[in-house]
């Protein structure tokens, strides 16, 4: 049985100007112990996908389809039962550690609350376990710092605290939404190394959302490329980097500086901007930015199909249309 099964997921938002389609008929599976990287430009639907999994959509949002965690259906689950899963079986690290911690509460208060809610621990036992987790994420002098407030920590240390909080209950699935974006480059690599280390120790699965293809290469087993709320390509990480099949994926990779290629190389960019999700074009959403488009691209939405074993691609070029 897969750890996570998402089938035909659609996420919509009602606005004064009409309905916005953030996630469109999206399906994928994750195995236990797998790290899935999700990449795409801003507005591609990455964050709304995981917020749909967590049932943390804005009040004007709705979702349809199926989301199963170890066979348990999450769509339609009462809030009380979903609250017992969030922070327990599924945990999430949000993008900005500067704003996700409550500035009015000590780190001890914020961490012990999680264990007192989900593990029915008393305060003393919860604090002891919280200290152990702060040590696990390499917070120096954890015993002396646990009673401090978030503003007394650097950005990198705050992100380590967020990771520690997310892992307190040893979740089956950890969702990390741009966990390194707000951090200095020198701090990003140790955070990724830490997540790899903790994943191996706890035998958990990770969904890693990021714009950074270097982060994807360093942590992922498989990669899902999203564009305009849809999956346009899915493959094992090494396969995707060596043999990208979709024009959008190739565009993303060609825009990244390479250190493994001798001599100078001109970086290319993808022309234009992502489409307005409220007014998606007929056919392929990438057509207006693609220099390889065919006539059928403006008429018919491409289907995600096998490019090679384990490698899926949604492109009319690929399938000889």
Give names to the regions the model predicted:
Residues 3, 12-25, 56-62, 78-81, ...:
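A short, flexible loop at the N-terminus of ABC-type nucleotide-binding domains that lies
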Residues 62-73:
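Conserved ABC transporter NBD signature motif
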Residues 73, 125-144, 254:
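Conserved ABC ATPase "signature" region
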Residues 74-91, 109, 117, 239-244, ...:
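ABC ATPase NBD coupling module
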Residues 168-172:
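A short, proline-enriched helix->beta-strand linker immediately N-terminal to the Walker B motif
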Residues 175-179, 183-265:
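P-loop NTP-binding/switch modules centered on Walker-like glycine-rich loops
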Residues 236-321:
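Charged, flexible cofactor/metal-binding loops and thiol motifs
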């Amino acid at each position: 049985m897969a750890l996570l099964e998402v089938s035909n997921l659609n996420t919509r938002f009602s606005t004064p100007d009409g309905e916005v389609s953030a996630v469109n008929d999206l399906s994928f599976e994750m195995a236990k112990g797998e790290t899935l990287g999700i990449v795409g430009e801003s507005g591609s639907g990455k964050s709304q996908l995981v917020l749909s999994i967590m049932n943390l959509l804005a009040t004007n949002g709705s979702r349809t389809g199926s989301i199963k965690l170890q066979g348990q259906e999450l769509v339609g689950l009462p809030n009380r039962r979903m609250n017992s899963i969030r922070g327990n079986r599924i945990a999430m690290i949000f993008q900005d550690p500067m704003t996700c911690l409550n500035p009015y509460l000590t780190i001890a208060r914020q961490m012990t609350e999680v264990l007192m809610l989900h593990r029915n621990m008393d305060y003393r036992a919860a604090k002891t376990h919280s200290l152990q987790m702060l040590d696990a994420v390499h917070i120096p002098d954890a015993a002396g710092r646990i009673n401090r407030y978030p503003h007394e920590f650097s950005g990198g240390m705050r992100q380590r605290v967020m990771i520690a909080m997310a892992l307190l209950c040893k979740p089956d699935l950890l969702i990390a939404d741009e966990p390194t974006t707000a951090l200095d480059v020198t701090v990003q690599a140790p955070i990724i190394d830490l997540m790899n280390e903790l994943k191996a120790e706890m035998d958990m699965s990770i969904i890693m959302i990021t714009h950074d293809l270097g982060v994807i290469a360093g942590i992922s087993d498989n990669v899902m490329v999203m564009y305009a709320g849809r999956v346009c390509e899915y493959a094992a990480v090494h396969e995707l980097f060596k043999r990208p099949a979709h024009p959008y994926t190739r565009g993303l990779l060609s825009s990244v500086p390479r250190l493994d290629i001798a001599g100078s190389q001109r970086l290319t960019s993808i022309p234009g901007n992502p489409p307005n999700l409220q007014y998606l074009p007929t056919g392929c959403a990438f057509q207006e930015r693609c220099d390889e488009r065919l006539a059928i691209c403006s008429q018919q939405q491409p289907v995600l199909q096998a490019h090679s074993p384990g490698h899926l691609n949604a492109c009319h070029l690929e399938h000889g249309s």
